[in-house]
Swiss-Prot record:
Quaternary structure, from the entry: Heterodimer of HisH and HisF.
Main location: cytoplasm
Organism: Xanthomonas oryzae pv. oryzae (strain KACC10331 / KXO85)
Active site per database record: 78 (nucleophile), 179, 181
UniProt KW Lyase keyword: yes
Protein name, entry field: Imidazole glycerol phosphate synthase subunit HisH
GO biological process: L-histidine biosynthetic process
Lineage of the organism: Bacteria, Pseudomonadati, Pseudomonadota, Gammaproteobacteria, Lysobacterales
Top-rank taxon, per record: Bacteria
Amino acid sequence: MTDVALIDAGGANLGSVRYALERLGVEARVVRDAAGLQGAQRVILPGVGAAPEVMSRLRAQGLVAPLRELQVPLIGICLGMQLLFEHSEEGDVECLGLLPGIVRHMTPALGIRVPHMGWNRLVPMRESALLAGLPERASAYFVHGYAAPVTADTVAACDHGGLFTAIVQNGLRCGAQFHPERSADTGARILHNFLEMSFP
């Protein structure tokens, strides 16, 4: 069985992510320090809340450098995905810098509410095993007020007043802006793909 490390960065969605993994037959280990990453074959960084507070917690746990040096597949979920980028406008905070790009505040407009909350369609941008088995026009559940730009690493985007990155992958580093644990079959499939796919 795959050894999965689930990082406890203080997010309220930790339990629901763990339960989503259990439904896939995976018993994840909850990790709160660098030692807990040893032996992991997959690492999951969930997150809700504010980027400065979660980055501060990761620093206090001694996890920033180990995450930057990680040599096994990593997926960030929601805020966890945003933290994979270089910087966030939320609190003007330096993030992990594993992916190029700056996370910016979403701009409200007529008919466009911020935070972005609810179901929205995924727009595939390039091929990736993360999308294997997803139906056309698959939708996922989003709750966020900041978003990462579309880059060459974007696997799928979403449109809410403009396109932003919904799924990202660069080598071993992956991310989902939406909540897979709240996205029914779509979320379960993406978690399954992350756990089972081959990485370069």
